[in-house]
Curated annotation (Swiss-Prot):
Residue positions binding Zn(2+): H101, H103
GO annotations of cellular component type: cytoplasm
Superkingdom of origin organism: Bacteria
EC number: 4.2.1.109
Taxonomic classification: Bacteria, Pseudomonadati, Pseudomonadota, Gammaproteobacteria, Oceanospirillales
Family to which the UniProt record says this protein belongs: Belongs to the aldolase class II family. MtnB subfamily.
Metal-binding as UniProt keyword: yes
UniProt entry keywords in alphabetical sequence: Amino-acid biosynthesis, Lyase, Metal-binding, Methionine biosynthesis, Zinc
Record PANTHER family: METHYLTHIORIBULOSE-1-PHOSPHATE DEHYDRATASE
Pathway: Amino-acid biosynthesis; L-methionine biosynthesis via salvage pathway; L-methionine from S-methyl-5-thio-alpha-D-ribose 1-phosphate: step 2/6
Pfam families in UniProt: Aldolase_II (PF00596)
GN (gene name): mtnB
Record protein name field: Methylthioribulose-1-phosphate dehydratase
Cofactor section: Zn(2+)
Entry GO MF terms: methylthioribulose 1-phosphate dehydratase activity; zinc ion binding
Amino acid sequence: MPERPYSTTVFRDAARALAATGQRIYANGWSPATSSNYSQRLNTDFAAVTQSGKDKGLLRETDIMAVNMDGQPASSGKPSAETLLHTQLYRFDGNIQAVLHTHSHASTVLTMHWPANSITLEGYELLKALQGITSHNSRLTIPVFENTQDIAALAAKVDQQMRSGHISHAYLIRGHGLYTWANDLPTCYRQLEALETLLAIELECRRLRGS
């Protein structure tokens, strides 16, 4: 059998960590049923990613597969088409080590009900949970992209916006969910938890304002 182009130990550790993280995400209600996908970089050319159609509340190590940076399988399993949105981030920045994508109630309602092309979070203490933010007197603008089945085209739009400096920690897809990334999986989960909490707060504030 030919040697794999990535460490099996690194893959096994990544699969274990992604499965455990996925169960935490599911328990918070951010990834119902088979929605969402999660990944972790294995090396320069490969990443571990959740397989398509897996129930996130029952996620196991065997539900994780390897793909190359073009989103093509490097182990058994079927990757989600959205894998290209993960690999775009890994190709864009070699420091990115983990990507988490969720389908929460708050992100869906906010992006479906309000037609703006971005959501701004400002003045929240919890913003300091995000990598590189040290003051609550900060403003985070999260771009909202239109949902599409043409994932390659969407990945190209995201890449263009990132190269223009318009995306820092996360982006949203209308009616679809949130993407965030970081230099390791625990930090990525921390950012996800902060962002999902802030989006839920923002939704409630807008309801109270009647806006």
